[in-house]
């Protein structure tokens, strides 16, 4: 049986920190699905159709990474995708507190789904999508935070 993992998020935008988590997870899994959650109630800064090719360009030489969009529960998407693992990056203890409770809820929804926590690389730990959106909104240079040009 292949080890398939999903790395879910809004990825608004997909950062160098996200890319680092995916690349570091590749030796652990046969396939990693970057799962972009499409929440109709959440106003995105960058449109999903704009972000998908940007993310795909980061992994164009990697054959075991896919980018998919999903609606609904992450645990259900994992099950539908045949994924047994869910990857989450942790920058700090605040992230852990939040992600731990989400992990427990996902386990309740699907008992076979295991969450794998990966500590963010120290040089990227300060990067967040919301920080990038704030800087970009005021025409600041965000090139050092993103693995692609916007």
Curated annotation (Swiss-Prot):
It is found in: Cytoplasm. Its cofactor is Mg(2+). It is an enzyme of class 2 (transferase). Its EC number is 2.7.7.3. PANTHER family: PHOSPHOPANTETHEINE ADENYLYLTRANSFERASE. Belongs to the bacterial CoaD family. This is Phosphopantetheine adenylyltransferase.
């Amino acid at each position: 049986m292949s080890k398939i993992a999903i790395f879910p998020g809004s990825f608004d935008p997909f950062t160098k920190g996200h890319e680092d988590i995916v690349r570091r997870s590749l030796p652990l899994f046969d396939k990693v699905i970057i799962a972009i959650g499409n929440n109709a109630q959440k106003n995105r800064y960058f449109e999903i159709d704009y972000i998908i090719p940007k993310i795909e360009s980061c992994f164009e030489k990697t054959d075991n990474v896919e980018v998919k969009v999903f609606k609904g529960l992450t645990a259900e998407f994992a099950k539908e995708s045949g994924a047994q693992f869910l990857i989450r990056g942790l920058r700090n203890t605040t992230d852990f507190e939040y992600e731990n409770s989400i992990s427990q809820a996902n386990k309740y929804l699907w008992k076979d789904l295991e969450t794998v926590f990966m500590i963010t690389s120290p040089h990227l730990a300060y990067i967040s999508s919301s920080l990038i959106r704030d800087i970009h909104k005021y025409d600041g240079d965000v090139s050092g935070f993103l693995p692609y040009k916007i």
